[in-house]
From Swiss-Prot:
The chain crosses the membrane at residues 211-231, 248-268, 284-304, 339-359. It comes from Xenopus laevis. Belongs to the TMEM237 family. Residues 47-57, 74-84 have a biased composition (Polar residues). The gene is tmem237. It comes from the Eukaryota. This is Transmembrane protein 237. The keyword Transmembrane applies. Component of the transition zone in primary cilia. Required for ciliogenesis. GO terms for biological process: cilium assembly; regulation of Wnt signaling pathway. Residues 105-114 have a biased composition (Basic residues). Keywords: Cell projection, Cilium, Cilium biogenesis/degradation, Membrane, Transmembrane, Transmembrane helix. Residues 1-116 are annotated as: Disordered.
């Protein structure tokens, strides 16, 4: 009763045999391969011992233990590398050595794990913390004030230095600005002239001058016929007086009339498109002002040229009673009456032509044909393009 019984420690239950298979096996350590030269027989011979001829075994052979099944991971990792390596359980490699100890073992190669792409190729394009600049004001490193540049904006100076004659000379800024502004204004106002603009302007000027000549010709023709009828008297009874007075004016007046008539005819024909004769005739039938005026001037020019010989005879007039006279007695009426009528018709024609032109002074078909030919010269091409589209 005096002695207390000491309680024994509680024994642990035995582990089942199946738990061994579930325990993960560690990899066997590499063993140094033993050379085949150091066999037991060689060792005995070197020591001076002789082997007996008896072949009976001195000690019983060890029984081979049955190989137990290991986990799939350990078995596959060992068998794939070297099937001749023995299996190790719980690190006890002394008990599980095979009889083939002299056999050389192949060294197992360690499989290198593939590195990630991020480790092999570092991201050099990434943004570092040093590259990030905050939105606030950047700190200016402290430097010597002698080497610091002024942070103020530069102010304009009144004088500028301009290179003249390979030297820089001071000049006032305001004068330079004024000259540059004047040059800019001059360049902006000055238009750019082309050959078509020059020809079109010359055509307009000639048309205006021609219209003035047409009006002057109409007035001159009327004045001429009035002078003739005044000098001839009533019913042309005083023709010798007309010849004696008008012989000084006959030749110059007829030449001046011819000059004005030619200029007016050219101006009138310049208003119609002579390249298309059919259109000109159609305009004459439709009483187009330019076409009608051209026709009147052409007829008047033809009539004036038909009476040029009579004007020459009037210029060399001498009385029939004198020797060498080109005029015979009682022939003045036969020669002068047709000439007076023709001058009257010419005056009427040029007056009507000027009236037609003055009603439509801006009409000019030749300008449309010469300076705007693209609209009418290629109508078939435009039709072909429309058909293809």
């Amino acid at each position: 009763m005096g002695k207390k019984q000491v309680a024994l420690p509680r024994a642990l239950p035995p582990m089942p045999s199946t738990s061994i298979d579930e325990i993960p096996h560690s990899r066997p350590k590499k063993k140094k391969t033993k050379s085949n030269n150091n066999t037991p027989d060689d060792v005995l011979q070197n020591a001076g011992f002789t082997t007996s001829e008896n072949n009976d075994p001195l000690s019983p052979e060890r029984r081979k233990r049955k190989k137990k099944r290991f986990s799939i991971d350990a078995e596959t990792s060992l068998t794939q590398n070297n099937p001749s390596i023995p299996v190790v359980l719980n690190g006890k490699d002394t008990d599980n050595q095979t009889t083939e100890e002299g056999a050389t073992r192949k060294p197992r190669r360690r499989t290198k794990k593939t590195r990630l792409a991020e480790e092999e190729f570092p991201n050099e394009l990434g943004v570092e913390d040093e590259d990030i600049i905050p939105d606030g004001h950047t700190k200016i490193p402290t430097q010597n004030p002698a080497f610091l540049a002024s942070s103020l904006t530069s102010q304009p100076v009144g004088k500028l230095f301009v290179e003249k004659n390979r030297r820089f000379q001071a000049a006032d800024r305001s004068e330079i600005i004024k000259t540059t502004e004047q040059m800019d204004v001059f360049l902006d106002v000055k238009p750019t002239w082309s050959s078509m603009d020059v020809s079109l302007t010359a055509h307009h000027i000639f048309r205006m001058v021609g219209l003035f000549c047409c009006g002057f010709l109409a007035g001159y023709a009327v004045w001429n016929i009035v002078v003739i009828y005044v000098l001839a008297g009533s019913q042309l009874t005083n023709l010798p007086n007309l010849l004696q007075t008008y012989k000084i004016l006959a030749y110059p007046s007829q030449c001046f009339l011819y000059f004005l008539l030619v200029l007016s005819t050219v101006t009138a024909f310049d208003r119609i498109d002579l390249e298309r004769a059919a259109d000109a005739l159609r305009g004459l039938l439709k009483l187009d002002p330019a076409a009608v005026a051209s026709f009147f001037y052409f007829v008047a020019l033809f009539l004036v040229l038909s009476q040029q010989m009579t004007s020459d005879r009037m210029n060399f007039y001498t009385p029939p009673t004198q020797n060498g006279s080109l005029w015979q007695t009682d022939t003045e009426g036969q020669i002068l009456q047709p000439w007076i009528v023709i001058n009257l018709v010419v005056a009427i024609l040029v007056g009507l032509a000027w009236l037609f032109l003055s009603c439509r002074p801006d009409i000019d078909h030749s300008e449309e044909a010469m300076f705007i030919p693209e609209e009418e010269d290629y109508p078939d091409m435009e039709k072909g393009m429309k058909i293809q589209g």
